[in-house]
A protein has these predicted regions:
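Soluble or luminal CAZymes and related metallo-dependent hydrolases
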Residues: 91-95, 193-204, 225
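The conserved 3'-phosphoadenosine-5'-phosphosulfate
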Residues: 64-71, 113-124, 143-147, 152, ...
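Membrane-proximal basic amphipathic "stem/tether" segments
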Residues: 1-29, 137-139, 152, 166-173, ...
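Residue-level detector of alpha-helix boundaries and kinks
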Residues: 88, 192-193, 218
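PAPS-dependent sulfotransferase catalytic domain
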Residues: 8-199, 207, 214, 228-240
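A detector of helix-start/N-cap boundary segments at the beginnings of structured domains
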Residues: 33-37, 195-196, 219-220
């Protein structure tokens, strides 16, 4: 039987032990914010579900998305105001370029979680996810059944991050495609595009690792598919490794964001 860590009686609610744990954790944690700084499509939304659902950390990823244009222009005031009322953040701008450095400066004594994924698997997911809403409208705005045309404002962050890679698809603008499958297949055949995307993805990981090289306690590198994910997060947060875990991995976005989507085991 696992030994229960000591907890102040004021947090001990037998009717809702998870709520008790969350209050205990958020009242006693010895760090400021926590940021998920993995690239998009590495499991950052699943990480958000865990941090919100298990640890009770306040988060709202749309806050960063809403002010991304300001951040791109070097104005962090709205973002800082939003994040002052939250404990965890992922997605834009934390998932982009070197914005983790700005977050580190704005919110000292914070923790950073870098979600990792096999490069080839990441690229496939990246292309599948952004093909319809970002890549196809840029290449061929009048493409067949293009019901996802996005305004230039909403594309700005994607172009700012992936402009060099999109330039490798420039010649496709002069082509006509009968179906989406033809266009997507043509993109997949462009080796330089794939290699450039993967190189940018891997280089960013290296930059993050270098930045935190002398601050190992501030950076956790994980894969969300790791069966020991919660143990590693617990230890990273200064908790006993086995204090809380979930019984099953998060399988799809339909259950994300809800505490009920995580079947947990709690020991205290």
């Amino acid at each position: 039987e696992k030994q229960k860590p000591e907890m102040d009686s004021k947090y001990n609610n037998q009717k809702n032990p998870l709520c008790s744990f969350q209050k205990y954790f958020n009242s006693t944690k010895n760090f400021n914010k926590c940021f998920g700084i993995g690239a998009n499509k590495t499991g950052t939304t699943s990480l958000n579900t865990i941090c919100k659902g298990l640890y009770g950390m306040r988060s709202d990823q749309m806050l960063g998305v809403a002010c991304i244009d300001e951040v791109l222009n070097g104005n962090y005031s709205t973002l800082k105001q939003h994040l002052n009322n939250h404990d965890f953040h992922q997605d834009l701008p934390a998932s982009l370029n070197h914005y983790y450095i700005a977050l580190d400066i704005l919110f000292p004594n914070s923790k950073f979680i870098l979600t990792l994924r096999d490069s080839n698997s990441w690229f496939k997911s990246f292309l599948d996810y952004y093909y319809e809403s970002k890549i196809k409208p840029w290449i061929y705005p009048k493409s067949i059944n293009n019901s996802f045309r996005i305004s230039l404002k909403n594309e700005k962050w994607f172009r700012a991050s992936w402009g060099q890679q999109l330039a490798l698809l420039e010649h496709l603008k002069k082509c006509k495609f009968k179906t989406d499958e033809d266009l997507k297949y043509s993109i997949l055949k462009i080796k330089s595009f794939r290699e450039s995307c993967i190189s940018a993805y891997e280089n960013r990981i290296t930059c993050i690792q270098t930045y935190f090289a002398e601050r190992e306690k501030d950076l956790l590198q994980v894969q969300v598919s790791d069966p020991d994910l919660c143990k590693k997060i617990n230890k990273f947060f200064g908790l006993p490794e086995d204090i809380i875990t979930y019984k099953a991995p998060i399988k799809n976005s339909a259950t994300r964001g809800s505490n009920n989507s995580l079947k947990y085991r709690l020991y205290y």
